Amino acid sequence: LLSRFSNYEPKLLSKEDPFQRIALLSGPEPQRSLLEEKILRHFDGLPGKSLIVRGVAGDDVSVDKNTTILNGIDDLTLSKALSRNPIVYCRSGYSTLMDLLHLQHTRAVLIPTPGQTEQVYLGARFARMFGFTCIGQHMSLPVENEILDAQYPKLNGGNLLEESVDQLLSASSSKAI
């Protein structure tokens, strides 16, 4: 899989990360801000710790003792947070989906950016293939117990590029004289 986390081993990065849910916000304005407001309302009052990565420039802020808001985050820190398998709320863009698969992440609420037909398609496809939840931005966010109680298929992200190259080399060497 092509992922910014390809150099990190999934599930072995962190035993200390406290977040039960992480929102990764992205997309054009005003859609990004509308999703942020919806996520903030949803996270308010939920038990446990939440992390919101806003994907904008500026100083980091924190809403309260249970919600940390960062404008940006480095790859290693994010991969550590995601490796603990919190519920992830994110857009269904290709790069984000590849990151989730690489880390063998099993609990995600995919929210395609309105008007982005590729994200709508990918969100629906990944919901069918991997058991993720996919909703429109205008819809209510799901009850977390439903996500936590669901039985998700085991993801086998692997390194598809490396495996494909190995198969190609193996096939071509067996045909060589």
Language model: regions and residue ranges:
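Short acidic-hydrophobic, aromatic-tinged amphipathic segments that line or gate anion-handling sites
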Residues: L2, T68-I73, G131-S140
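Donor-nucleotide binding loops and adjacent catalytic segments primarily
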Residues: F5-I87
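Short amphipathic alpha-helical segments
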Residues: L35-E37, V63-K65, L100-L103, Y121-G123
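Short secondary-structure boundary/capping elements
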Residues: I73, R91-S92, L160
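Short acidic active-site motifs
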Residues: L76-L78, T96, P142, S164
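A donor-sugar binding/catalytic signature common to diverse glycosyltransferases
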Residues: L78-Y121
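Nucleotide-sugar donor-binding patch of glycosyltransferase catalytic domains
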Residues: Q104-A150
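C-terminal amphipathic helix plus adjacent low-complexity
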Residues: E144-I177
